[in-house]
Design a protein with these regions (language model features):
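The conserved beta1-alpha1 loop
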Residues: 2-3, 86
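Short, structured coil segments at secondary-structure junctions
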Residues: 18-20, 135-136, 217
Length: 225
């Protein structure tokens, strides 16, 4: 299968000619995913996820999350934190963890959930909005043209895209009165960053759990995952 059910047509036909039983999904993987998500009950999905964080994944996920928050002092009284959601599983999980933290924390802090649309297709945008609704996350979505800006950049487009995304998130969060942004990078991302720096750049680079912004005074980046 493929995303839209077009590229997989020829592959399925070729496999059938070779004697295999092969099919191409009508509308592709995205159409199947939208249909599957539509069958799910939003309230039941939210409750199931929240219960799993409190019980099944309490030690593995929740306790490690709160341990990082305490150890690195990532959340302080009266903080206003912009939890940045890309639409992937890591940032969605982080958003649910912050919801739980706000319920059980000893001191007050505010949380804003942000989704930056860098130029997603309508299908991807619809999936992200649907997942937010199912998980009970009220997020503010703002649009940018980052994908269009880096489309023709031949050298290090991913680096430029990441830098631009970070800048937009800082700027929008600051306008909302936030003093921190939270990103969903985790331990695997740290290892990948170190290895990529060593293999491609002959240097050791890593990700810090918290980082003060140089371009946005008073803003701080935190990585509680």
């Amino acid at each position: 299968y493929c995303a839209h059910g077009e590229a997989s047509l020829d592959a399925a036909q070729a496999l059938c000619e070779q004697g295999f039983e092969a099919y191409s999904l009508t509308g592709g993987y995205l159409a199947w995913l939208r249909e599957e998500l539509a069958r799910q009950d939003d309230e039941q999905t939210r409750l199931r996820v929240e219960t799993s964080l409190r019980k099944r994944f309490r030690e593995k996920i929740w306790c490690n999350f709160t341990k990082a928050v305490r150890r690195y002092e990532l959340v302080q009284p009266n903080d206003r934190i912009a939890v940045c959601i890309s639409g992937g599983k890591d940032s969605m999980l982080m958003a649910k963890l912050f919801q739980e933290l706000k319920l059980h924390n000893k001191y007050p802090f505010e949380v804003k959930f942000l989704v930056m649309d860098p130029g997603y297709s309508p299908a991807n945008r619809q999936i992200i909005e649907g997942n937010l609704r199912r998980l009970g996350i009220e997020a503010e979505i703002f649009e940018t043209d980052i994908f269009g800006s880096v489309y023709n950049v031949e050298k290090s487009p991913c680096y430029l895209c990441a830098r631009m995304r970070r800048g937009y998130l800082y700027s929008f969060a600051q306008k909302l009165g936030c003093n921190k942004i939270a990103l969903g990078h985790h331990y695997d991302d740290v290892i990948e960053t170190i290895l990529m720096g060593m293999l491609w750049g002959a240097q050791v680079q890593t990700m810090m759990p918290k980082l003060h912004s140089t371009n946005f005074p008073g803003m701080e980046l935190i990585r509680p995952m």
